Amino acid sequence: YKRQQLDRIEEVVKKYQKPFIFSEAGCMNIHGSALVPNNWELQGKEDDAEQADWYLAMFSACEKRDWVKGFGIWDWPGSMERKSPYAVCDRPAEAVIAEEYSRCAKNR
């Protein structure tokens, strides 16, 4: 996960002193997507482990930033027939997200 992006965002958050959430946080299950998680055109081999590892790294990096108040996970389809590479349902990343959200709920 690119910590320099968090540094860049932190400057703006501190300047304006406003709450911050990631309205869309996600990474495809395509090999190489952890380097460019916002590139939805990336083609390649499916890599569920890379997607799960990206979520672990993102949560780990963000928990060190007290100004990060939440995440909207992209993509959570309403139908499994329309499952995209960003979808986490029935993939290892789903368990990573569930564990993180459960941990956060216990610490409230």
Report residues per predicted region.
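Short amphipathic alpha-helices and their capping/turn segments at secondary-structure boundaries
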Residues: 6-21, 59-64
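Active-site environment of divalent metal-dependent phosphoester hydrolases
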Residues: 28-30
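Structural recognition of the beta-strand scaffold that forms the well-ordered cores
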Residues: 19-24, 69-73
